[in-house]
Amino acid sequence: MSNMPVLIITLLLFSMYISTAAQKPTEIKCRYPADCHIMCRKVTGRAEGKCMNGKCTCYY
């Protein structure tokens, strides 16, 4: 039997974990992604974020 399906599932789960660990949801209200850049720089040190459901989500 091949170990390829197990490897693919493991990589998929690991990549999903990494992507959620790199996000920091905030309570900062926004209307546009540009509203989040200054606040995300204060929270994470990087101006990378987007406006989702009216609140900023910052990325590391």
From Swiss-Prot:
Keywords: Disulfide bond, Ion channel impairing toxin, Neurotoxin, Potassium channel impairing toxin, Secreted, Signal, Toxin. Pfam families: Toxin_2. Expressed by the venom gland. Its main location: secreted. GO terms for molecular function: ion channel inhibitor activity; potassium channel regulator activity; toxin activity. GO terms for cellular component: extracellular region. The keyword Metal-binding does not apply. Disulfide bonds join C30-C51, C36-C56, C40-C58. It comes from the Eukaryota. Belongs to the short scorpion toxin superfamily. Potassium channel inhibitor family. Alpha-KTx 12 subfamily. Inhibits voltage-gated potassium channels. Has the structural arrangement of an alpha-helix connected to antiparallel beta-sheets by disulfide bonds (CS-alpha/beta). This is Potassium channel toxin alpha-KTx 12.7. It comes from Lychas mucronatus. The lineage of its organism: Eukaryota, Metazoa, Ecdysozoa, Arthropoda, Chelicerata.
